């Protein structure tokens, strides 16, 4: 976009698609980046923002500190919402690497600003088919604009069917008087999943407000998740036996969401969001080992309610003050039958409150201070109410060297709540040596993070260097202990984790047609105490985009990884990944085909852990992680005046508190 000019605080910046504003980076897509993108994720990927990792295949957007929150015109968005964005309807993108105002509290924020229309409509169709195994993703949508109002209907169907995950596993269980060894080899695996969704949405937008109402329905069914395995036992007893593990799941979730953003005055805004959902989950597992049979059947009803309100006022000298109140509530009832009969009723609620103050100090310094608290409550029907108060704080200090360079330091304090599927008093049979058990008395996890970063936009080069230290107190992790002749797998919250991390991120624009992005990461993780686990790893990735007329070619790759899973306390080693794609874009058509790991037949995912009484190593392979290909076709037909493509802000995840075995 060599010819584009951007006016910023009375300074015109020419030829730059990255513009550093007071509290965020304004990213202006050029024609090449827009033309060769089919979705909102494609466009974000093409922008090659140095500190962002965008997986356009899975819709995951993250930065070094964690997952990035996505917004469209200031409204919080989910995967489908961004996936359904039409790139040519996007004016620009705001990247809040140090979120302030309504975005305060996020690790980082992306806000898509779209071109709004007042008449016309569209019909869109898109489909993606994987080559190498069965996976299809098909969507249809329509939108009608009339004045300040818009109405949309979106629907989709996703199906997967492949040979499942095959495992080779060695285990050692150290009982007081003897040791048992077990080798597991998968002989057959089958997996099938189907998902459907429907969304109805009405929106009214004026200069004073943006309000919407949305009704959604999600159905997610896994009719087949089967594994047949050969078990070889040695040590105390020596024998071989076959096992079969069959699981079925079915979830249905309707939800209603109301959203309103109000410009009270030119300097004051108020945002309110309320969402409620009901979920019906069914889970069945049958495990056989020789003539022994284990059965679990669970019916669950889950109610969820989320409410948030944000107020922000702009003060003099580019300062601002805001407040944020949130409450998240879940109530679940599960009826277990089979090996263990039980009724589990749990409610969990977390209330959070924050103040946010942003202060400019002279021309070079700025500070963002966000103090607050979390009040977490949960109660299992057989236990007393658990209550945890936590201090939360985000503070960022920025020194602006010049318009293209910054130094930044941050100190953050937070907390993390346990997953609702951990909080129960249930026992579940894993196999006839192991039991999985819930724990309703888990502590509140505390997070402490200190970071420093240098960021620069230097002509064609954009880069970032940063270092981060993180300490996690009362980390929730897997716990193993012996009970009679069984190994019990449960949960604990009395261990700490320390992370020392460093990163180099850069992107370079060789020409209008050729762009590249490079990331390098260093991770050093320590889990002191009982197990004294340490791991070091270096990870690098490279992405290259080349544009020529209506064609775009992408090549990407990342090195093998080694990381400690802070929940399982296992060291996980993942293989290198590489791939390429070519796309053709013309008017309303976007056609893309690609391949991942085209020269790799046997990608293996390795995992191992050593505990005082239980050690294991595991290698997993799956058809979906070997060499595969895909073809994706999208077409949009506009009628009347062209309109922005509707954004499906459905959350297609289905919540569940059911404790399941792997």
What are these regions (language model features)?
Residues 304-306, 352, 439, 443, ...:
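Outer membrane beta-barrel strand-and-loop segments of large Gram-negative receptors
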Residues 164-179, 224-240, 256, 282-291, ...:
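Outer-membrane beta-barrel translocator domains and adjoining extracellular loop/strand segments
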Residues 249, 284, 288-368, 380, ...:
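Outer-membrane beta-barrel transmembrane domain signature of Gram-negative proteins
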Residues 105-127, 229, 273-279, 284, ...:
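Surface-exposed extracellular loop regions of Gram-negative outer-membrane beta-barrel proteins
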Residues 141, 520-527, 542-585, 589-617:
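C-terminal beta-barrel architecture of Gram-negative outer-membrane proteins
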Residues 5-10, 14-233, 243-278, 305, ...:
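Membrane-proximal, glycine/serine-rich, low-complexity loop/turn segments characteristic
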